[in-house]
Amino acid sequence: PSEPFLACLDTPRHREIVQWFTCDKVLTDPNFVTGGASVTTDEYTEAHGGIGICYETGEASDTSRVNQVIDDIRGLMAHLKITCDESRPTPLREREVFELVGQIIVTSNGFRFAEGWGKQSWEPFNEGDVIGYHGENPLVMSSTGRLVFPKPELYWTEGNRVGCLARKLNQ
């Protein structure tokens, strides 16, 4: 299973809500790196005055976190005074907050991940790391960050994304 995370903006209003969810990471995309425009459900909700949050809990076939998600929602609802649940948990600690800053796109030269890269989301990289190649040209990281959403090679086609790059916002 993949590591759970919350996808949303990073504002005080959002932090009030995300404190009730059991995961360690928040991924924000204020510059629409993933879609080039407002294309996700959380972005749509934001565009219409709501607080949009997407709780990515893992692969669709992995139902091991269902009870935890229910508990998280109950805690949030009690906090918002939608229910009178006296057994609500306490808010969670600070999370790591990351911002999407770029995409890795397959070029006419193709693409391949360097040995050991592209196996899972949230892989940390450092400035100077070579994480892949466009043909024979290395993809060298210009800063520290994380590789997120690496796609299996089956889905790699010219002009399409094979992964995204994120930088940590809070230290």
Predicted ranges, named:
Residues P1-Q171:
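Structured catalytic-domain cores with a bias toward divalent-metal coordination
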